[in-house]
Amino acid sequence: MKLLNVRRHSSNGFTLIELMIVVAIVAALAMIAYPSYSQFILKGNRGAAQSYLMDIAQRQQLFFNDSRTFAPDANQLNMTAPERVQDNYTVSFAVDLNAPPTFLITATPKSGTRQVSDGPLSIDNTGEKLHGVESW
């Protein structure tokens, strides 16, 4: 009796349909995740700017205690903006030396960055914080 030698050939790859299904699933997940990621980056950059503005305001108060005037810029306070802030915001100082002396520090989003839609952030000598027209 002779046995037939039949070999089974197994497929060791993926079919085109299986690959297309995986690509479609990955694309759907990316469409869901990207807006959340963008919001995460926006909030992170805003948080960095808020923290920097708080640091400046605190140093302004210390500077005022020593010199009875507010510093006109961050250089006088020996401060440098963190990279996240430098890349996304322009920080400006408005100092009024008339009695009583006041300051307003504003971080305005740079054009061409994600932060443009976020609006300016500011803090004054009383500690009042503004985000556009709202408080932080």
What are these regions (language model features)?
Residues 12, 17-21, 42:
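Internal alpha-helical transmembrane segments of multi-pass membrane proteins, especially GPCRs
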Residues 65-136:
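Periplasmic/extracellular, small/polar-rich flexible segments of pilin-like filament-forming proteins
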Residues 1-14:
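N-terminal leader/signal peptides at the extreme start of proteins
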Residues 19-36:
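Alpha-helical hydrophobic helix detector
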